Amino acid sequence: MSGVRAVRISIESACEKQVQEVGLDGTETYLQPLSMSQNLARLAQRIDFSQGSGSEEEEAAGPDGDAPDWGGAGADQDDEEGLVKFQPSLWPWDSVRNNLRSALTEMCVLYDVLSIVRDKKFMTLDPVSQDALPPKQSPQTLQLISKKKSLAGAAQILLKGAERLTKSVAENQENKLQRDFNSELLRLRQHWKLRKVGDKILGDLSYRSAGSLFPHHGTFEVIKNTDIDLDKKIPEDYCPLDVQIPSDLEGSAYIKVSIQKQAPDIGDLGTVNLFKRPLPKSKPGSPHWQTKLEAAQNVLLCKEIFAQLSREAVQIKSQIPHIVVKNQIISQPFPSLQLSISLCHSSDDKKSQKCAAEKPGQEDHLYVLEHNLHLLIREFHKQTLSSIVMPHPASAPFGHKRMRLSGPQAFDKNEINSIQSTEGLLEKIIKQAKHIFLRSRTAATIDSLASRIEDPQIQAHWSNINDVYESSVKVLITSQGYEQICKSIQLQLNIGVEQVRVVHRDGRVIMLSHQEQELQDFLLSQMSQHQVHAVQQLAKVMGWQVLSFSNHVGLGPIESIGNASAITVASPSGDYAISVRNGPESGSKIMVQFPRNQCKDLPKSDVLQDSKWSHLRGPFKEVQWNKMEGRNFVYKMELLMSALSPCLL
């Protein structure tokens, strides 16, 4: 067998990997073999650090044992060296375990020492005093020192905390003031239209999107505010974003509308500086650029309104032509009446402010008409947007409405002109100015009559629901103390643009012009008729009989204002009669007729011999009305009727 050549046989284990799981279908799941690092970790986990090493026990027992003989020392040492040489190692990680254990012990000791020194909870290090303290004072002194140190430590902790809080609050405030440019730009985009052109950010102030046709571009530029030093304290009104608007839109502007009775000389007209309003203040909490842009947009709108009014003033053909001089438009709605519309634009420079301060005058600006001008221009914008009609069907090209309606049923030129004829901005504002002036003149006339004439009383009840071209007022003429029985005169005045329409209680309608004298004469005649109507109502209440009544008497002196009214009433017994004549200018005249038997100055007649003729009423006698007692006309008349009525008792 020794001569046979050896054959190498490869022997493999039946299973190189451990089986983790065998499935129901016979599939085996194997565990992956450990890598070198995982194998090293598995071996390190087997280290038992609680067991002591044999070398430490021998070192501990060596000093305690007896010293060996000097004679046999060399032999024993050789024997031990031989044993050590041939003694196998107890464990390969023994030295590593020992070094880690000693390092852990040293780290624990170092941690304890540092904790005691830092926290001072477990130990307090005090310097050793040279002189020994008295036994009685030492405990109190130590206690006082410990209290002082504890209080000082607590105070230092509180001061450090307060300092940290102060720093945090200051940092928060600085962060709020130092707002980011992008966040401000986002806020600006929420309110205004922006677009980026190259490296610039441009915005739009115009009303083109709302239907405006004003040619001004109204473009502003958004810039970054770099005029502040970030190293210094930041002011409260600092904003990293700023806007740059055109120079012609800076400052503030408004449209002044005034009505003057006397027109000045045309040669004196020119560019007037009527700006008396303070510059708009920014709202609390709103950025300064918002106020700046709103003021610029308002200037642009005022310029558009004035341009539209100037264009219409030149184009409209009227009996009295409108005058346009620089920043003023002058019109005459009524004779001796002037309507002035001015564009007042004030920039932020000091010169314009000084000019406005040097020329104080009476404020006659009509804020209602200014507000109505803004409403009218917005309505004009809306009409511009709605005038474009979409084609039907949608695929058809755009075209004007009257072109699409042309055909067999097409309108002629006159019908088209009547449909398209609309009032302009200037015509509407002139009509509103006429109505406002006529309404104020009517109110002034009624107030002057009410303050000048005490009997009868005139009352005006203005309606709260009015139109821009029409207002209504209810006029009541009454006597004090007799309001329930004297309700005959009730007038409804409908104030229009050029006329006043008067509606009586019985439905009669009278048209009055814009002249103040016509309304005054009409009210005076109605007040005169009220006295006669009051006597009629009083006679019915007291049982007197009305013999005659007339609102327009043809006898007697002619009144320059209206006509006189008259009434004649008789007592219940028929013995007495009272005749009242009242005129707007002549006033009241009262006559009383007595029975013949009470008239001593009548001449005796030979014809009337029978006594029955003595019961007839004699001639009229005038009453001295000024000497009658009573607070008003109706009260005096009541006293007169009571005196002439027979006593029923």
Curated annotation (Swiss-Prot):
Listed GO MF terms: nuclear thyroid hormone receptor binding; transcription coactivator activity; ubiquitin protein ligase activity
Species the sequence originates in: Mus musculus (Mouse)
This protein's record includes keyword Transcription: yes
GO biological process per UniProt: positive regulation of transcription by RNA polymerase II; positive regulation of transcription elongation by RNA polymerase II; positive regulation of transcription initiation by RNA polymerase II; protein ubiquitination; regulation of transcription by RNA polymerase II; RNA polymerase II preinitiation complex assembly; somatic stem cell population maintenance
Record's protein name: Mediator of RNA polymerase II transcription subunit 17
Gene encoding the protein: Med17
Assembly behavior: Component of the Mediator complex, which is composed of MED1, MED4, MED6, MED7, MED8, MED9, MED10, MED11, MED12, MED13, MED13L, MED14, MED15, MED16, MED17, MED18, MED19, MED20, MED21, MED22, MED23, MED24, MED25, MED26, MED27, MED29, MED30, MED31, CCNC, CDK8 and CDC2L6/CDK11. The MED12, MED13, CCNC and CDK8 subunits form a distinct module termed the CDK8 module. Mediator containing the CDK8 module is less active than Mediator lacking this module in supporting transcriptional activation.
Family stated for the protein in its record: Belongs to the Mediator complex subunit 17 family.
Entry keywords, A to Z: Activator, Nucleus, Transcription, Transcription regulation
Recorded GO CC terms: core mediator complex; mediator complex; nucleoplasm; nucleus; transcription regulator complex; ubiquitin ligase complex
Protein's job: Component of the Mediator complex, a coactivator involved in the regulated transcription of nearly all RNA polymerase II-dependent genes. Mediator functions as a bridge to convey information from gene-specific regulatory proteins to the basal RNA polymerase II transcription machinery. Mediator is recruited to promoters by direct interactions with regulatory proteins and serves as a scaffold for the assembly of a functional preinitiation complex with RNA polymerase II and the general transcription factors.
Keyword tRNA-binding: no
